Amino acid sequence: MPELTDLSYVHALCEKYDFALSKGFGQNFIVNPGLPPKIVDASGVDKRYGVLEIGPGIGVLTRELAKRAAKVVSIEVDERLPPLLAETMAGVDNFKLVLQDVLKVDLKALIAQEFPGMPVAVCANLPYYITSPIVMKLLGDRLPIESLTVMVQKEAADRLAAAPGTRASSAISCAVSYYATSKMMFTAAPGSFYPAPKVTSAVVRMEIRPTPAVQVEDEEGYFALVRAAFGQRRKTAANAIASGLGMPKDAVTAAIEAAGFDARIRPEALTLEDFAKIQSTLAR
């Protein structure tokens, strides 16, 4: 099997199957041979693990995962890719392709069916345009997984790894911190991919917490509050929450002050615990 990161082979493979990379699917294939082992190292995957991969492309990361893990199940939405993967993954017995949209798949059922008795990890080179919805589904569905290790745009990685209460925090930062601990592992230059994106990429590892970081009575309401707070970044938390939730500003301001905060506080200055306090006072 030729090296899947060899650009001449990638071109020949795409030409053989009349395959044109799709901007709509955010396809950027890995062409840096040192990158797949580094990603798998960061994931901590070994022969005990079942691995759920999202967006295998032509199988560059997939082959490395299959070398290290007990089993790899890759979810792919592009119906043109199976013939290419049939060639590049030929002879890899612990690999299975699921041709579905990851946002529509019952992942709990899939994991139960494909990985009985195994610890499970997610490892993926995610399409940049849909990073947040995929991460939120993987976390919010409370899947029986130990970790998520994802290659994403550096800007998105900064948000995924940011601690709530810091300048870089956002709604997705709060969600990640609620469900997991996160760490930026390393960056990858644009030339590591074909076609080369215009931005630097980065790998983030998220380790799932056994229980959420804070206890809230109404999780759906909690995240609605967080999303509202960050929905208008240049506004104070009071203004943004009032606007986002359709509540009187006076009531929101009173709740924020009753929770012990200055009414002019910005959302990025609030921690998970702070949001929980504000939600509790709003609910009274």
Tell what function each PLM region has.
Residues 253-255:
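A short C-terminal helix-loop "cap" of Rossmann-like NAD(P)-dependent dehydrogenase/epimerase domains
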Residues 202, 206-208, 214-251, 262, ...:
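An accessory alpha-helical subdomain
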Residues 263-269:
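Short, flexible active-site recognition loops that position polar ligands and cofactors
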Residues 1-220, 224-228, 257, 268, ...:
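Catalytic cores of RNA-modifying enzymes
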